[in-house]
C-alpha cells in the first residue's frame, strides 16, 4: 500500500523534514508519496523573506522522483499520482503550485488567510466570483451522488481484499496466528523467560544489561525492531543475528541490508528518528525502538512530546545517563536532565 503526505510550505522548511526525507531517499521507499502545497505563503506572508531555495532540486538530490503540476489541474494530479505509484524504487515528491484562499477578494495570496477564518464578506465574494448560490454549504445533487458512490466502491474493494486475506490465512495458519497476536497487542506466553536478572550490588554497565535484555526479547518478539542515531556501538542496541533494514543496495562492509531486516540505521538524525518511530508505531503492528545518549534526547524532544500526546507505542533507549561518563566532556553529559 501507499503512504501519502500533504505538506505545506512550512513543513518543507522544518529541519526534521530534511532528516526524514534524506533517509527516505536512502531507504528507497517507493510507496511514500508527498504532495507539497506550494503557495508561497506562511503566517508572516510571502515565504521569500525567509525561504527561497529550490525545493524540488533538493528532493531530487535526496534520491526522490520529483513531479510538478498546478493545483487546479485535476487530470495532471491524477497522472502524477499514477506515476508515483508506478515508481517502486524511489519515494515521490509532487509539487502542487497553488494560490492560497483563491479567489477571496482581499485575502487571496496573503498571510491573512493562512491561519484564520476568511469571514462572511470574503466568503460572499468567493461565491460571487465562482458563481455559487449565496447559501451556506451548497452541494449539487450530482456531486452528492458521485461522492456517495464511494461507499459502494469501498465495499466492493473491501470484499475483494477480504477474499484475498481469507485465502492467505487458510494457507498460512502460523502467520495468521502471529498477525492476530500483533494486532491484538498481546505478548506471547513466556516472552520474557530468557530475560536475565542480576543481584543487587553486581557491577554491570546499565547499557550492557539493556543489551542483554534486548537480545533475549528479540528472540521471542519478532515484532521488535529499531536502531539508533549513529550510536549502535555505544548504546548496544543492535539485534544480533538480524540484518539491517533497507534495500540490498545500501549494504556496507559492516551491515547487510534487506527489506526484512530488524536493525534500523537513522544516521545522526535524532529528531527524524523519533518522528519516524512514531509513524511506524501508529501504523502498527510492530514495536519499534530508538536509541541515543540521554543528552541528545534534546534534539528529539519535539517528536517525543508528540508521541506522548498521540500515545504512540515507541520504546526510547537513552543511555549515558550519568555525569560520570565524561570522556567527551560537558557537551555529552546530561547535567540539566539530572
Predicted regions: what they are:
Residues 1-149, 338:
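Glycine-rich ThDP/TPP pyrophosphate-binding loop and its adjacent helix/strand module
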Residues 1-2, 148-338:
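Thiamine diphosphate
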Amino acid at each position: 500500500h501507499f503512504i501519502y503526505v500533504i505538506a505545506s510550505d512550512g513543513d518543507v522548511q522544518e529541519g526534521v523534514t530534511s532528516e526524514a526525507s534524506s533517509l527516505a531517499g536512502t531507504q528507497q521507499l517507493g510507496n511514500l508519496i508527498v504532495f507539497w502545497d506550494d503557495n508561497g505563503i506562511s503566517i508572516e506572508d510571502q515565504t521569500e523573506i525567509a525561504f527561497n531555495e529550490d525545493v524540488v532540486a533538493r528532493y531530487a538530490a535526496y534520491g526522490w522522483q520529483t513531479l510538478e503540476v498546478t493545483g487546479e489541474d485535476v487530470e495532471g494530479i491524477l497522472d502524477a499520482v499514477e506515476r508515483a505509484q508506478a515508481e517502486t524504487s524511489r519515494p515521490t515528491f509532487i509539487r502542487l503550485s497553488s494560490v492560497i484562499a483563491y479567489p477571496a477578494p482581499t485575502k487571496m495570496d496573503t498571510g491573512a488567510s493562512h491561519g484564520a477564518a476568511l469571514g462572511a464578506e470574503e466568503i460572499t465574494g468567493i461565491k460571487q466570483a465562482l458563481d455559487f448560490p449565496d447559501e451556506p454549504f451548497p452541494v449539487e445533487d450530482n456531486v452528492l451522488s458521485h461522492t456517495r458512490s464511494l461507499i459502494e466502491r469501498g465495499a466492493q474493494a473491501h470484499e475483494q481484499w477480504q477474499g484475498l486475506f481469507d485465502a492467505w490465512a487458510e494457507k498460512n495458519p502460523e502467520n495468521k496466528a502471529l498477525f492476530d497476536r500483533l494486532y491484538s497487542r498481546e505478548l506471547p506466553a513466556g516472552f520474557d523467560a530468557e530475560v536475565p536478572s542480576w543481584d543487587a550490588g553486581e557491577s554491570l554497565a546499565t547499557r550492557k544489561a539493556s543489551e542483554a535484555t534486548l537480545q533475549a526479547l528479540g528472540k521471542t518478539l519478532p515484532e521488535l525492531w529499531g536502531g539508533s542515531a549513529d550510536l549502535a556501538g555505544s548504546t548496544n542496541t543492535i539485534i544480533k543475528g538480524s540484518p539491517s533494514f533497507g534495500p540490498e543496495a545500501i549494504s556496507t562492509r559492516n551491515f547487510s541490508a534487506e527489506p526484512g531486516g530488524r536493525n534500523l540505521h537513522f544516521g545522526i538524525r535524532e529528531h527524524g528518528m523519533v518522528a519516524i518511530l512514531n509513524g511506524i508505531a501508529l501504523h502498527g503492528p510492530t514495536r519499534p525502538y530508538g536509541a541515543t545518549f540521554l543528552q541528545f534526547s534534546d534534539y528529539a524532544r519535539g517528536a517525543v512530546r508528540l508521541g506522548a500526546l498521540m500515545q504512540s507505542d515507541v520504546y526510547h533507549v537513552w543511555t549515558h545517563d550519568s555525569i560520570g561518563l565524561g570522556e567527551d566532556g560537558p557537551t555529552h553529559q546530561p547535567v540539566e536532565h539530572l
